[in-house]
Amino acid sequence: MTAGSSWFATREHQPGVWLVAAPPHVNCFLVAGRERAILIDTGLGIGDIRGAVTGLTDLDVLVVNTHYHWDHSGGNGAFDDISIHELGAERLQRGPDMAKLEPYAAYSRRMLERVAEFRATDEEFFGFLSDETTPRPFPDGFDFADWKIPASVPTRLLNDGDVLDLGGRTLRVLHTPGHTPDSICLLDEQNGLLFGGDTYNTGPIYAHLPDSDVEAFARSTARVAELADGVAFVYVAHFSRYAEIGTFLNEVAAGFAEIVAGEASFEESRDDDGGDARLARFARFGVLVAS
């Protein structure tokens, strides 16, 4: 089932697992057990994410931020219970510098200007887009000049190996530093699902930011790749292809191994803020590293 009448699009991808997306800005995921639910990331702080979630479950909801970045924690203020890896707590409580988000606002405007042409081309020739992957206008009355993402205070700090019990379903915390020092993935071993945050993406994976660490990224992805045989789906936080099969874990690990070995080819590129970076292209993803 999809629901796309608002800024958020939702789809139940697996039993008890819903995509809650602001396409293509960010993909959040709601995971429900018998007793409680977990919302993995809260998006940009635009639109009513709590309303989107309460339309899917009446269970108590714990927010888990996969890392401190504003595009994963922007909607935290709509919820009471928030958790993050302990290394991200201070940055989460500091909140973002909104002035530094102005390039993203410009990027978003450019994207919306081009959506109509892209969608028409897609409908005529390709059929890639679906409701939950099609960019949509910002909510009525939204103005970037008034956009604010308040700091948030976590109620629980996470560490590697912690188990979150939802009642009949558990999620295990995997600390996967690389994108940021506090980055985590969440593993549903029983159902073979891995929620990758920004450790995995189907577009460029960001390994070029000031607190990114390419070698740590390689170690993290190599570790998670050891679990690939038990993973059916990998859920990613950005871009329209929000779910990949488990072998994607092996591909990403191999890509980072190639990069740290000095064997990857790069081209000059930019990120969505217009920042300079170098891009290594692989079959189903890319990796941005610092110039």
Q: For the regions a protein language model found, what residue spans apply to each?
A:
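Short Pro/Gly-enriched beta-strand edge/turn motifs at strand-loop
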Residues: 10-15, 141-147, 167-169
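Active-site HxH/HxHxD metal-binding segment of metal-dependent hydrolases
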Residues: 48-163, 202, 251-262
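A generic local structural motif
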Residues: 4-6, 24-27, 48-52, 68-70, ...
